[in-house]
Design a protein with these regions (language model features):
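Bacterial Sec-dependent N-terminal signal peptides
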Residues: 1-22
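Beta-propeller blade termini and top-face loops
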Residues: 19-220
Length: 220
């Protein structure tokens, strides 16, 4: 009887503490819409906020994008602190993702010819404090506004490569869900600036892409 009771208790415990499934992209999107509406209806929406700087910790830097023609200008992405821009070699920084629906950054790439910014959301460092993202964000006005270009269920985007000869051709590496299986992971490619994506590499629903690079003499 004791053995039977112990077995039943172990089974109940296993069920109670089993891994929770990943949050569906549709649920995340609904939450973002609700957040946007709350911000619009907030009684303090017109009050200015002033940055007091890093108080407890400054956050994890996950990526840089440096202007090859002007190396004192660059963007810095933080795991859960958005994207920041400097044009004076870091003497001062300006936040450029305050108007985006998320601050969780995995990687950043910039087309320095026209100023278009691509941000892969979702921190790529795998830990219990890593926040998932909402896909791939794109800004064509240097961060004033952002568009979601898809891959919303990838959760963590690790790499973005822009074809220097054709900025509409972009390759993206996606980690996928950290602690559960999903199919939106691997390598994706667009030839129309992110309107549509084609999966070019998929191993299985448990394997993601941490980093990708391209031959500088042959992007494809």
């Amino acid at each position: 009887m004791n053995k039977l009771f112990l077995s039943a208790l172990c089974l109940a415990t296993a069920v109670s503490f089993s891994q929770q499934p990943a949050t569906p992209a549709t649920v995340v999107a609904n939450g973002i819409n609700a957040k946007t509406q709350l911000a619009q209806d907030s009684p303090v929406k017109n009050l200015p906020f002033i940055s007091i700087g890093p108080t407890i910790m400054s956050g994890r830097v996950v990526d840089f994008a440096v202007n090859p023609n002007n190396p004192i200008e660059f963007y810095v992405g933080y795991a859960s602190g958005g994207l920041w821009h400097t044009n004076n070699n870091g003497t001062s920084f300006t936040p450029v993702m305050d108007n985006s629906p998320t601050q969780n950054v995995g990687c950043v790439a910039v087309d320095w010819q026209n100023g278009t910014i691509w941000v892969g959301t979702g921190e790529v460092n795998a830990s219990r404090s890593s926040y998932a993202g909402i896909g791939l964000l794109k800004s064509e006005d240097k961060g004033k506004t952002w568009q979601n270009m898809g891959l919303t269920d990838s959760h963590h985007i690790s790499s973005i490569l822009i074809n220097p000869s054709n900025p509409d051709e972009v390759i993206v590496g996606a980690v996928g869900h950290l602690y559960s299986t999903n199919d939106e992971r691997g390598v994706f490619k667009t030839t129309d600036g992110g309107k549509t994506w084609r999966k070019t590499l998929f191993i299985n629903n448990e394997t993601g892409i941490i980093e990708i690079s391209a031959n500088p003499k042959n992007f494809n």
